[in-house]
Every structure is written in C-alpha cells, then in structure tokens.
C-alpha cells in the first residue's frame, strides 16, 4: 500500500491503521515534507511499521522509482487557502492537479 502525502495529517492517519492491522504488509508513506509539521509524524509512522520515502508527486521520476503498489491512497495536496495568495499559484496547481494525475 502506498499513501502519497503520507506524512501529512490525513495521510499519516489513513496509513497507520492498515499498517497496524496488517503488520506483515508493505505500507509506504510518500511525502515531500513541504508542509511544516509533517516531519513530526515520521516517528509515529515508523512506530506503526510504515516505511517512509521522501519524494514529490510532481516528479514522475520519484513515483517511478517505487514498486507499483496494490493499493494507492492519494492524499498529497496543498490544502492552504492562502496558497498562491502571493500571486504565484504554480505550486498549488502542480501539486493538486499534476501531482494527482502523476499518481
């Protein structure tokens, strides 16, 4: 199982439950750690038996480096309503649209 955005609030919680209930399965959290605080979930993920892979959904090469999963949970996103308020919304579009397409 692969969860993109796996170190974020939603992604980490959705990833830990199956990892705990199926300890023999290969569960991976994939995240670029762009959002402040995401790194605080890494210890909890490791304790639950989740493998962490740092990568970016905007990069097809990062995704191609992974073994194709049986299950994909796509939680990567730029959720901030202020994203792009500075006049540059490229990160928002590249993550939320292109990133989801790449998955």
Mark where each language-model region is:
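N-terminal Rossmann-like NAD(P)+-binding domain of SDR-like oxidoreductases, especially those catalyzing
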Residues: 1-103
């Amino acid at each position: 199982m692969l969860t993109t955005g796996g170190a974020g609030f939603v992604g980490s919680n959705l990833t830990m439950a199956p990892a705990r209930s199926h300890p023999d399965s290969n569960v991976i959290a994939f995240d670029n750690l762009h959002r402040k605080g995401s790194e605080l979930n890494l210890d909890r993920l490791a304790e639950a038996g989740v493998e962490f892979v740092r990568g970016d959904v905007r990069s097809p090469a990062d995704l191609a480096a992974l073994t194709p999963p049986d299950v994909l949970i796509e939680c990567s996103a730029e959720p901030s309503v202020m994203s792009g308020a500075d006049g540059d919304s490229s990160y928002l579009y590249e993550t939320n649209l292109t990133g989801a397409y790449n998955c």
